Amino acid sequence: MANSPVWYALIPVALVGAPSPSHATQYLSVSQAQRALFPAATVFVDRTLRLTPAQRKAIGQAAGIGPGATQPVWEVRGPSGRLGWLFIDRVTGKHELITYALALDAAGTVRGLEILDYRETYGGEIRNPAWRQQFVGKRAGSVVRLGSDIRNISGATLSSRHVTDGVRRLLATFNQLLRG
């Protein structure tokens, strides 16, 4: 029975049902991203936004992509007052979620972007500092479009596109709800 051809026939069936390997890497925790993006900060005040349907619609119209019902964001303070805002966001790469942090100065200009978690097998090049640097200086109203002012990464097109779309959405969120 152990050498029976029936057992050999069952091997492919077992492999089909086996879980496929996944690739998940956490590069930074939220607190590590906070310190990396705002080294002079003395306090991070949780200001998570709970968006109304009207706010979600306005942000979606401004960004071309709508937000979820809540948006994690921290007001960043230092010895001299508000230093800026730190958003934590998730977008889908090709199949899996990408978690990233976006740092804005007090006026809403991007000062940095860090990838916290990347779960895709391929496309991790979005962690490349030169690619992330393209976002620095962008603000609400900036183009922030893949293939326009943000270069695509070959092999990571969907990850590049979705992070870019997410940044544009967060800039619109700042402009609609936090500016002032």
PLM regions: where:
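Intrinsically disordered, low-complexity segments
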Residues: M1-A2, A18-S20
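Bacterial N-terminal signal peptides that target proteins for export
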Residues: M1-A9
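Bacterial N-terminal signal peptides
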Residues: Y8-A18
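Flexible, solvent-exposed loop/hinge segments and secondary-structure transition points
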Residues: P19-I153, T157-R161, D165-G180
